[in-house]
Design a protein with these regions (language model features):
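ATP-dependent carboxylate/acyl-activation modules
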Residues: 1, 5, 267-317
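N-terminal glycine-/serine-/threonine-rich beta1-alpha1-beta2 phosphate-ribose binding loop
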Residues: 1-90
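Conserved active-site and cofactor/substrate-binding residues in soluble primary-metabolism enzymes
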Residues: 6, 10, 14, 34, ...
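General beta-strand structural signal in soluble alpha/beta enzymes
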Residues: 54-55, 72, 95-97, 120-124, ...
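Rossmann-like NAD(P)H-binding beta-loop-alpha module
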Residues: 67, 114-183, 188-195, 202
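Short glycine-rich anion-binding loops that position phosphate/pyrophosphate groups of nucleotides
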Residues: 75-77, 153, 262
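Rossmann-fold NAD(P)-binding glycine/threonine-rich loop
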Residues: 80-86, 90, 97-137
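Substrate-binding/catalytic subdomain of NAD(P)-dependent oxidoreductase enzymes
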Residues: 173-277
């Protein structure tokens, strides 16, 4: 299987790295070798293994009949949407890690994929390395999902863990997170809750069977959490966590993103540092928990590659 990677930033380069590190195992699981033929990027990468694979025009990929799968790791909605739509219309399967794209245009792209007999998969868009999309789509289809509650942002979870363990204040832990590379220079999407808001919108859209607009979800971040709040919670044997939650009420789902004080017996209370966790409740399954590294180059790239392997394995079914 020849594939293309659109975007050679942190995740895109991670995808290429994972495919090389686990080349033999991936080929065995996919049923054939997976080879990166093109990397789409504005930059050149002289002296690197991909220097002869770089292209600057997405149409080169769309018009090449050898390319069966395209990985999108560009980020943002545009031009990612235009490029991905073109790939699907050209009969290419697409795997993406782009939560902004999936939250804003996921329903439309799924329809385009269906109309052209291909797949659009986005396991890496929600929990980084945590497999949650595939279980919801395949393993839990017999269940009525009544609740999804998750710690879906590693940056804020790291910050709250630091505040809890060291008694540090918000500004101090934010700087520490930025120094360690967990938080961006502009941390707004994390600390104001916009990132987990998009992720819970994606998960709710899957279980509801219709697009849930993240802009309609009430969203609060952690900027107002103080050391005093942390002390109060600890005295009550509780932990403060930024939770993204979706609950079935009647025939619809109600979503909320906000800091919660949760009892130390709750499964999510022990999810600390940059780790993420997703708690599910189904009417047949009961309670289930998914836990793992929620961000980072290789965990996220691993989830993207899992989608690529899945699509390669089932390309003729």
């Amino acid at each position: 299987m020849k594939i293309a990677v659109m975007g050679y930033g942190t995740i895109g380069s991670g995808v290429v790295e994972v495919l090389e590190i686990n080349k033999e195992k991936i080929a065995k699981r996919a049923g054939e070798p997976i080879e990166v033929k093109y990397v789409l990027d504005l930059r050149e990468f002289p002296g690197t293994p991909i220097e002869n694979k770089i292209v600057h025009d997405y149409k080169v990929i769309a018009e090449d009949p050898e390319i069966g799968i395209v990985v999108e790791t560009m980020g943002g909605v545009e031009p990612a949407f235009t490029f991905v739509k073109a790939m699907l219309e050209a009969g290419k399967q697409v795997a993406t890690s782009n939560k902004n794209l999936v939250a804003a245009k996921g329903a439309e792209l799924i329809k385009v994929a269906r109309d052209h007999g291909v797949n659009f998969q986005f396991e890496a868009s929600v929990g980084g390395g945590i497999p949650i999309i595939r279980p919801l789509n395949k393993c839990l289809t017999a269940d009525e999902i009544e609740e999804i509650t998750g710690i879906l942002n590693g940056t804020t979870n790291y910050m709250l863990t630091k505040m809890t363990e060291e008694g540090a204040d918000f500004d101090e832990v934010l700087k520490d997170a930025q120094d360690k590379g967990y938080a961006e220079k502009d941390p707004t999407a994390d600390i104001e809750g916009h990132d987990p808001c998009r992720k819970i919108a994606i998960l709710t859209s899957l279980v509801a069977g219709q697009q849930v607009d993240f802009e309609d979800i009430h969203c609060e971040g952690i900027t107002k959490i103080t050391p005093e709040d942390i002390k109060y919670a600890k005295a009550m044997h509780r932990a403060i966590k930024l939770l993204a939650s979706s609950r079935k009420v009647g025939d619809s789902y109600t979503c909320l993103v906000a800091p919660y004080m949760i009892d130390d017996t709750h499964p999510l209370s022990g999810v600390n540092g940059v780790f993420n966790g997703v708690f599910l409740r189904g009417n047949v399954l009961g309670d289930a928990m998914f836990y793992g590294s929620g961000a980072g180059k290789l965990p996220t790239a691993s989830a993207v590659v899992a989608d690529v392997v899945d699509m390669t394995k089932h390309q003729n079914t």
